[in-house]
């Protein structure tokens, strides 16, 4: 008696003429709202109060392993142009960032390894998150920033176009490699300090995330892909909106 097929990845009948898995599209990343609550929890407040690496005053934040792809040097230039300290979380080629900071007269704070709640607190208390990565596949940090009420300022490139609509839930900006580009970044950083913008951008950002990028949406997307390949799996009528920027 033939065994019921319970693994389909290697089965030719589930592949197209080029032997690629059939019916496979984009499975969007997801955000856990409990990790990024809209309001500061008591635990987060206590963590922030005793956080020994807490910056003094307003600061910009960048998250991710420092490297060319992440645009870490460009982030330093933006901070220098805005005359605000840059806090970096994620390690990587931080010596290059330090040299860039010395070159442009920027204040750079390199965080040691910190835990998730400390990152959330750093994110919530930042003036703005800046993301200058090249060819970013998706980009979770702008979503995380929006969830905790911090403006996300990103380059108008690749994955960031899936999550940020310029002027609606953050700012999408040109590369900061020209005088005009840097001017637009400094103006956006000023806008990020206005309470009306912070409130409106965060509200729109949370709405987009919860309507497109929740764990339920990710699970449903996976279930529907499996169902399309003939796997017996329960699916629901959850509305899955396109991930791409509707603008």
Predicted regions and their residues:
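Nucleotide-activated donor-binding/catalytic signature segment of Leloir-type glycosyltransferases, i.e.
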Residues: 97-117
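Glycosyltransferase donor-sugar binding loop
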Residues: 31, 63-66, 83-98, 112-113
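A short, active-site helix/loop in glycosyltransferases that binds the activated sugar's phosphate group
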Residues: 1-26, 31-41
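Short alpha-helical donor nucleotide-sugar binding micro-motif in glycosyltransferases
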Residues: 113, 121-126
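Short hydrophobic beta-strand element within catalytic cores of glycosyltransferases
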Residues: 151-155, 164
